[in-house]
């Protein structure tokens, strides 16, 4: 998170446009979400205090309604004043949530950072990986509304690091989900570095003050345990300072690849060589550095086919004055940062971005882009008068013609109010067919925004269930064909920053009443096709016919 200033060309000029056909309504209090992040801050300005927390949408009890998990920190040893734990909220199916943390066995104190959700043992129940400072924790879902800590039993214990984002994926396509964990820098409270803006008072350090730390890759043995294959697979790299990770198929070979956002170090694009090894392609692909060849402060990340070209684009949030990156595939295997040309670059100049996500907010068939922002230094205005500590989010609406317009201030609900935001996740918690938003803030509350689409646009929602491939179908690619074009989505964990969105895929149909054709490419190489599928929500099991979900 280096403080640098770039002078880049002007971005695209937005023309007059119609008001968005949706509103984001703040329903946090009405929904019963009462949470405040504990960073443990006590005046010493330890680096981890300013980095968290993450959040997740998940259906932990399998009732078909999305629940909410919020990651929390804790007081530092020797300065304990209160107990703070993870927070799990169960969806009451009426717009409200109940705090079931204690009942679920998650009232655990740890200095948490991020969360990754997936059914790693293929038993039909989503499990939790919570990252943090110290030891990460793996909680297995019992299927009875509770979780048990299986960290040591699974072979993930005995490691201490400053872990951030994480991702479940099946890199060897054996049907068992493997685990990738981002690690940030080598940090310990007893070795904290003194950094200062004025030479007198301690401030939060930027990562240049610390050595990097390698990410970890764990292979799922299929028996409930994991093997550390970081070095064996070519991932080991102690120069990295990793904060975000996203899943993609970079070379369109059907094998999952990895894109890692690094802070003040080159980003990494790990291409799956299909033999248990990965090769870093980031420099060759054009995503390692900024356009002028410098490493930026990459935080949040997402990958999606935002222009319906069939090729995934890449969004990465960066430090203020570095501009948010939006990489577009210009030729096979090569990307160019188009952010400044399509309305995102200059709009994000004064933002320090964290969580980001592509989703179709207005259900028009084109993926929009949300980014949440907030500085790490509460005194930043004394240094840069145009940069605030609390910052408004961005909601870039995709016009379908290659341009984006920030409509955060036009969607109501106080959405554009400045926040010291970190985590971002999306999911349809009220089952009305559009995608709602969950945001966490550093040393502050969480926010739940209900999306109300009033334009008349419809959606097609698909929940995939693997039978031969991993049960969550992570890595599956779905293509939806309508007369307006072809949309493609991948089922994925990870992405954003420290957070996890729902695994169900949402396709905007606009005013169309159906999709002409749906093609599902499963992670195990099988392909299914369904024709004339009407708007609505469906379950799609591998090798079986599509079935409509019960109406609310």
Cite the ranges covered by each PLM segment.
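Beta-propeller blade termini
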Residues: 52-62, 112-122, 164-173, 177, ...
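Gly/Ser/Thr/Pro-enriched helix-cap/hinge segments flanking short amphipathic alpha-helices
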Residues: 41-42, 344-346, 381, 385-552
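Asp-box/WD-like beta-propeller blade repeats and closely related beta-sheet repeat scaffolds
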Residues: 105, 111-116, 133-135, 140, ...
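Short loop/turn motifs that recur once per blade in beta-propeller domains
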Residues: 23-36, 41-47, 98-110, 150-162, ...
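Short, conserved, GDST-rich strand-edge loop motifs in beta-rich repeat architectures
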Residues: 72-81, 185-209, 372-388
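Hydrophobic beta-strand segments that make up the repeating blades of beta-propeller
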Residues: 68-72, 127-132, 179-183, 258-261, ...
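Twin-arginine (Tat) signal peptide motif
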Residues: 1-7, 222
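N-terminal export signals
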Residues: 5-19
């Amino acid at each position: 998170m280096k403080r640098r200033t770039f002078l880049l060309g002007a971005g695209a000029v937005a023309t007059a446009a119609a008001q968005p056909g949706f509103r984001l309504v703040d329903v946090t209090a009405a929904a019963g979400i009462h949470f405040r992040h504990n960073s443990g801050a006590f005046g010493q300005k330890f680096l981890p205090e300013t980095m968290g927390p993450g959040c997740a949408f998940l259906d932990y009890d399998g009732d078909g309604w999305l629940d909410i998990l919020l990651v929390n920190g804790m007081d530092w040893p020797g300065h304990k004043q209160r107990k703070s734990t993870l927070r799990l909220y169960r969806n009451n199916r009426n717009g409200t949530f109940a705090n079931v943390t204690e009942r679920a066995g998650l009232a655990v104190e740890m200095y948490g950072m991020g969360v990754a959700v997936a059914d790693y043992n293929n038993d039909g129940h989503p499990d939790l990986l919570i990252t943090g400072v110290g030891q990460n924790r793996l909680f297995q879902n019992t299927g009875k509304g509770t979780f048990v800590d299986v960290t040591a039993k699974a072979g993930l214990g005995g490691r201490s690091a400053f872990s951030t984002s994480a991702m479940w994926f099946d890199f060897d396509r054996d049907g068992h989900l493997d685990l990738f964990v981002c690690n940030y820098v080598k940090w310990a409270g007893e070795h904290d570095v003194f950094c200062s803006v004025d030479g007198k008072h301690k401030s939060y350090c930027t990562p240049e003050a610390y050595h990097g730390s390698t990410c970890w890759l764990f292979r799922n043995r299929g028996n409930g345990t994991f093997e550390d294959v970081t070095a064996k697979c070519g991932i080991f790299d102690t120069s990295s300072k990793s904060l975000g990770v996203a899943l993609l198929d970079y070379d369109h070979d059907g094998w999952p690849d990895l894109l890692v956002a690094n802070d003040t170090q080159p980003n990494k694009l790990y291409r799956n060589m299909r033999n248990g090894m990965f090769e870093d392609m980031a420099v060759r692909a054009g995503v390692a550095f900024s356009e002028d060849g410098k490493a930026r402060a990459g935080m949040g990340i997402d990958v999606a086919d935002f222009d319906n070209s069939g090729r995934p684009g890449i969004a990465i949030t960066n430090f203020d004055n570095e501009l948010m990156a939006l990489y577009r595939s210009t030729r096979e295997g090569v990307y160019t940062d188009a952010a400044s040309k399509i309305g995102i670059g200059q709009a994000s100049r004064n933002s320090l971005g964290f969580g980001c996500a592509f989703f179709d907010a207005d259900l028009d068939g084109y993926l929009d882009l949300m980014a949440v922002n907030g500085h790490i230094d509460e005194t930043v205005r004394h240094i840069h008068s145009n940069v605030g500590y609390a910052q408004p989010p961005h909601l870039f609406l995709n016009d379908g013609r290659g341009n984006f317009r920030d409509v955060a201030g036009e969607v109501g609900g106080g959405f554009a109010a400045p926040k010291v935001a970190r985590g971002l996740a999306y999911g349809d918690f009220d089952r009305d067919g559009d995608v709602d938003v969950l945001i966490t803030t550093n040393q502050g509350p969480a926010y739940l925004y209900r999306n109300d689409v009033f334009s008349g646009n419809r959606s097609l929602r698909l929940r995939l269930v693997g039978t031969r491939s991993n049960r969550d179908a992570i890595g599956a690619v779905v293509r939806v064909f309508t007369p307006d074009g072809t949309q493609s989505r991948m089922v994925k964990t990870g992405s954003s920053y420290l957070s996890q969105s729902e695994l169900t895929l949402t396709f905007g149909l606009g005013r169309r009443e159906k999709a002409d054709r749906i093609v599902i490419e499963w992670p195990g190489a099988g392909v299914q096709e369904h024709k004339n599928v009407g708007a609505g929500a469906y379950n799609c099991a591998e090798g079986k016919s599509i079935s409509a979900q019960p109406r609310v």
